Amino acid sequence: MTGRVAGNVAFITGAARGQGRSHAVRLAEEGADIIAVDICAPVSSNTQIPPATADDLAETTDLVKNLGRRIVAAEVDVRDFDALKAVVDAGVEQLGRLDIICANAGIGNGGQTLDHTSEEDWTDMIDVNLSGVWKSVKAAVPHLISQGEGGSIILTSSVGGLKAYPHTGHYIAAKHGVVGLMRTFAVELGQHGIRVNSVHPTNVNTPLFMNEGTMRLFRPDLENPNADDMK
């Protein structure tokens, strides 16, 4: 077995499509087995962005298996700690260990100034993009600690975790919070040889970003913005 993470197991949230799928496939290419979760359903009735589906998660599963790697996949909401823990525990029992946590799941909604953001949009955003990250790490990190072999945790923040943009204040707050989680987990888990980092993507060609609502948000100067206008 060859590859940079050969013999490792990675837990990835939001793995049905987009960045989560790309992480799963890339890690599998480098020799890792995968525990993959995604809600595969709307986060709330107010969600404007089409959600990932069970078929999307099945496609991720097939892509990993076609690379000769094992995968445990389940439909799980990152807001549900008990469900997350159950899947991680089952995955570790089946795959034998856990080395990497990739807390990637996230949503986009709204598009109002903070003083006009609805309580529902605010709550959904914080529950998924901030609390969901914390719950994902909390559910999985005991395995890294108990193994005593270190490990790696990657939290998906955003360029919005480094600076502010108008009309996305709840998203900005959540992603800045992810940076706080990263820094705190890093100082708390360093004694176990576990390193913790955040990544900060900008515009990414995924369904979460390349949709009518988001394109209109970022290009209000255009009547009908398209993907080319987002470059």
Q: Where is each model-derived feature located?
A:
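The beta1-alpha1 cofactor-binding region of Rossmann-like NAD(H)/NADP(H)-dependent oxidoreductases
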Residues: 54-55, 75-87, 119
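Canonical Rossmann dinucleotide-binding motif of NAD(H)/NADP(H)-dependent dehydrogenases/reductases
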Residues: 3-41
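Active-site helix of classical SDR
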Residues: 137, 174, 182
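Active-site loop-to-helix junction immediately N-terminal to the catalytic Tyr of the SDR YXXXK motif
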Residues: 117, 164-172, 184, 212
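Residue(s) in the substrate-gating loop at a strand-loop-helix junction
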Residues: 158
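Substrate-binding pocket helix/loop in short-chain dehydrogenase/reductase
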Residues: 112-114, 118-126
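Alpha-helical segment proximal to the catalytic Tyr-Lys
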Residues: 142, 187-191
